[in-house]
Regions:
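ATP-dependent helicase/translocase motor core
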Residues: 1-188
Length: 188
């Protein structure tokens, strides 16, 4: 590919990925799962976790996935996102974080997503942008897969609190960590 595209290879790949994710039947998930084909060359954009460790080559490829985290990402001149997580350079998750001690909650983050985030911004475009957007504070987490202004629907992404018939919404309180610590301990 370098021989064909020379110094424009990186820009060509990025443009091709963008075109594939934004076309009518395209999506970021499809591009991640199936890769892209450029000039009859297949380019894998992510490696899934192999079911077993029998094939060391697949295990090695999986370990080469690069997850990165960026704080304060500007999606446009007017939209700054608290945290964005990338997989091999492609934005897959966004987070609006609020602090209960400062008088804010996940509800403020939901309001921000509904009113301050343009669903047509490339980062938030349905199917082509982030796969999931999280609104969270130190006690609760909510998520949506599609930003749609005031019509954006958020689902709780909490562990639940209590056991059996006495279980309730939210997350358990812990003495030594935040109620939402499962997000970085178990999910991410």
């Amino acid at each position: 590919l370098r021989k064909i595209y020379k110094d424009d290879l990186e820009e060509t790949i990025v443009s091709f990925i963008n075109a594939e994710t934004t076309k009518t039947r395209g999506s970021l998930i499809e591009v991640l799962k199936h890769g892209i084909e450029l000039s009859n060359q297949k380019i894998e954009l992510m490696y899934t976790k192999p079911a077993t460790t029998f094939n060391p080559e697949l295990t090695k490829k999986y370990s080469q996935n690069i997850f990165s985290v960026m704080e304060e990402v500007w999606a446009s001149d007017k939209e700054r996102i608290d945290v964005v997580i990338f997989l091999n350079g492609l934005a897959i998750m966004s987070f609006e974080l609020k602090c209960n001690a400062a008088g804010q909650s996940y509800q403020d983050a939901i309001y921000q997503f509904r009113t301050d985030r343009n669903p047509k911004t490339r980062l938030f475009r349905f199917k082509a942008g982030t796969l999931v957007n999280f609104a969270m504070d130190l006690e609760e987490v909510y998520m949506t897969t599609k930003l749609d202004g005031q019509a954006t629907f958020f689902l709780p992404f909490n562990m639940g609190n209590g056991h059996g018939v006495t279980a309730g919404a939210g997350n358990p309180a812990f003495k030594d960590k935040y109620s939402v610590s499962y997000m970085w301990e178990d999910i991410l």
